[in-house]
Each structure stands twice: as structure tokens, then as C-alpha cells.
Amino acid sequence: MNITLLSGKIHRATVTQAELNYVGSITIDQDLLEAAGIMEYEKVCVVNINNGIRLETYTIAGEKGSGIICLNGAAARYAQVSDKVIIMAYAQMTKEEAQKHKPNVVFVDDNNRITRKTNYEKHGQIVE
């Protein structure tokens, strides 16, 4: 039996754009995708810290170093520029694989530049 675990997370990214008339997805700076181990076109969950909305979409790689976080299509209705979001990808694995698994957690500043990366997260404690 497989279970689903967090595989990659970009924590408290700042929305830089919202493009309602685009076909869909979230555009994310490729540097952030790589750091979090999230692939282009991978399904992600986006949580808007400002309004509590949680949505699913897929990723599109944005220009490296651009800091872009752009909600596209219908998802653009759920965020405004400057909102803070958490972007999470999940992976299915066996229980044996899960016991050894460590997620990639990426923290960013207000300009979506990486400030810290870790592979461990526990309530009240983050270990690098």
C-alpha cells in the first residue's frame, strides 16, 4: 500500500502576478522549483496565507532568478499581488520508503529569494 507524503514545499512565497486570462497553473521561478524538488507540470497544492484558500493546480517554470510566483487562470481569482502563499507537492510511496523520506522545504524572503533550505519539519521546530 502506498501513502502520500510531502515531497517539496516553498514556504511563504510572495505572489508577484495574477493572470486571470491565462489557461491555468502557477508559474514559479525555476530556481525555487529546483530547490524544492518540484518538477514543471507537477501537481501542487497552494495555500493562501492571507485568505486561507487552498487550491490545486500544476506548475510552470518561470525564468530563473526572476522571483516570479504567478497564479494563472481561475486560480488568479484566489490571490492578489503581495499575498503570501505556501506551495506544496506530494509524492506517493510505500511505508518503507516513507520511513526514510525527507521533504525539501524552502524558505524565501519577500522577494522570493531563498533564505534557507531544510529537509526536516516538526511542529515548533525546523532543523537545517
Curated annotation (Swiss-Prot):
Catalytic residues of the enzyme: S25 (schiff-base intermediate with substrate), Y58 (proton donor)
Lineage, highest ranks first: Bacteria, Bacillati, Bacillota, Clostridia, Eubacteriales
Record-listed Pyruvic acid (Ser) modification sites: S25
Highest taxon of the lineage: Bacteria
Protein family membership: Belongs to the PanD family.
Gene Ontology biological process terms, A to Z: alanine biosynthetic process; pantothenate biosynthetic process
Entry function: Catalyzes the pyruvoyl-dependent decarboxylation of aspartate to produce beta-alanine.
Keywords: Autocatalytic cleavage, Cytoplasm, Decarboxylase, Lyase, Pantothenate biosynthesis, Pyruvate, Schiff base, Zymogen
UniProt-recorded name of the protein: Aspartate 1-decarboxylase
EC id: 4.1.1.11
Keyword Cytoplasm: yes
Subcellular location: Cytoplasm
InterPro entries referenced in this protein's UniProt entry, alphabetically: Asp_de-COase-like_dom_sf, Asp_decarbox
Post-translational modification: Is synthesized initially as an inactive proenzyme, which is activated by self-cleavage at a specific serine bond to produce a beta-subunit with a hydroxyl group at its C-terminus and an alpha-subunit with a pyruvoyl group at its N-terminus.
Quaternary organization: Heterooctamer of four alpha and four beta subunits.
Gene Ontology CC, one term: cytosol
Cofactor section: pyruvate
